């Protein structure tokens, strides 16, 4: 019996449970469009000119395509992987032995014991306070949190990412970081190659202003503006998570 049978069915399972997506899996298709669409525009309207203008132009386009493929694989590994879901209990845990019975207990009816909201455990010689989750009926390990969207407790929970439609936790955080890092590099690569295309147009009709060159290649103009804005978002996210990794924190 698979462990995922005990998980909330708000999740989406594919390939016999090998792929696990969050309830907002549709947002993944939006991300796919935002990645594949601009790359397709680049290959069709900019890449063909790079192949003509530069001896290694074809290699430039191939690098972009391969890098895009890597980004998509990392996206799938981030969005379709178990982030570290802790299977919920079917029943509340047994109360500790030192839980006191009510003073007015007659003995004829078993009292309803209320579990403490927190308890202390020892981790590497340090006392850590852990909390009880009423939904999953378990005491959450350190750095574990309950996601209100997926409705599961996730180990080393960082955040629920609406863009990839999945929680980011212990098991998929490395893929998430590599995804945003590789996406940042892809944006930078496309921007530089579009600049090369504009530069070539300026050289062909010298003296040619930048604005005239941009008018002659609207695809490059669009892509440079698009990846510039995208880099502010995903690049800033990459820098932020690099800092978190360096300081051993979660967001």
What is each of the regions a protein language model found here?
Residues 1-113, 168-251:
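Hydrophobic alpha-helical transmembrane segments that serve as membrane anchors
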Residues 133-136, 147-150, 161:
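Short cysteine-rich clusters marking metal-coordination/redox-active sites
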Residues 137-143, 169, 176:
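Loop-to-transmembrane boundary segments
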Residues 127-130, 141, 155:
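Processing junctions and N-termini across compartments
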Residues 137, 151-154, 165-168:
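Cys/His-coordinated zinc-binding microdomains
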Residues 111-120, 128-134:
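Short Cys/His-rich Zn2+-coordinating modules
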Residues 62-63, 118-121, 134, 148, ...:
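Eukaryotic intrinsically disordered and solvent-exposed regulatory patches
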Residues 142-145, 156-159, 163, 170:
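Short, non-ligating residues that shape and space the ligands of small metal-coordination modules
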């Amino acid at each position: 019996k698979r462990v995922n049978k005990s998980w909330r069915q708000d999740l989406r399972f594919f390939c016999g449970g090998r792929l696990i997506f969050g309830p907002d899996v549709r947002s993944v298709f939006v991300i796919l469009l935002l990645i594949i669409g601009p790359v397709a525009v680049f290959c069709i309207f900019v890449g063909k000119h790079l192949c003509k203008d530069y001896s290694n132009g074809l290699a430039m386009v191939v690098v972009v395509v391969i890098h895009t493929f890597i980004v998509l694989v990392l996206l799938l590994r981030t969005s379709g992987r178990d982030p570290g879901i802790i299977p919920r209990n079917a029943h509340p845990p047994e109360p500790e032995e030192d839980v006191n019975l009510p003073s007015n207990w007659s003995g004829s009816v078993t009292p309803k014991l209320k579990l403490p909201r927190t308890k202390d455990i020892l981790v590497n010689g340090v006392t850590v306070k852990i909390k009880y989750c009423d939904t999953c009926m378990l005491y959450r390990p350190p750095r574990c949190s309950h996601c209100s969207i997926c409705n599961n407790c996730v180990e080393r929970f960082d955040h629920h990412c609406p863009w990839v439609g999945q929680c980011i936790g212990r098991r998929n955080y490395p893929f998430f970081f590599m995804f945003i890092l590789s996406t940042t590099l892809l944006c930078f690569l496309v921007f530089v190659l579009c600049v090369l295309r504009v530069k070539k147009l300026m050289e062909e009709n010298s003296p040619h202003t930048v604005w005239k060159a941009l008018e002659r290649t609207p695809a490059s103009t669009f892509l440079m503006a698009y990846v510039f804005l995208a880099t502010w978002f995903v690049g800033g996210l990459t820098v932020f998570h690099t800092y978190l990794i360096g300081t051993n924190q979660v967001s």
